[in-house]
Structures are given as C-alpha cells and as structure tokens.
C-alpha cells in the first residue's frame, strides 16, 4: 500500500500558523506543498499597523496563489482571543488549536514553535 497523500484541488488552502504570546505573535504562511511564503512575521498585538500588515500579507498570498487561507492560532491562555476576533472580523476562516495537540504531534523539543507550527497543524488537519 502506498503512503502517497492525494489532495482534492477543491480542498487546497493556504495555511497560516500563528504562535500566540502575551504581547506579540509569530505568523508563518505555507502553501499546500508545505513551502513557506516569505519569512515569519512578528505581529505586535498593540499596533494597528502590525495587525493591518498581517492581514495584508495573508490577503496578498491568497491573491498570488488563488487559494483561500485558513488560520490556525495556538491557544495560549486568553492571549489568542483578541487576535482571533480581529482576524475573524476581517473575514478569515480561523481555528484555535490546543497547544497540547501541537506539542504531542512532534518529537522535536522546541519551546516556541514559530515556523514549525504550520507544518504540525497541516499534518493534524491533512493527516500527512
């Protein structure tokens, strides 16, 4: 039996992984083939310019690759809630992931996930 994963083109999406902290979050954007779009972006929670730039980066990737995005925020206490609401109010498909799930899906001992969170979440959602 083959271990190949076959994707339905109607189900492809851009994955946006956000590692949420108290004062700032790290955002990474990945394509369905697990290639990253640009560098991780630091979102400052108290800066409207930073929040606007994050939204612009997501929309730019959606337009460039003609795919919708799905945003996955790692739940960190209550710190994820304002960012979740902001992005949802901007029209994005957002989900909050329990950090225990993301930490249990890898054997890599990393305190902060940053870039890896996108790949971990994609594996959880697509069972790659």
Stretches with model-predicted labels:
Residues 1-128:
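Phosphate- and other anionic-substrate recognition elements at nucleic-acid/protein interfaces
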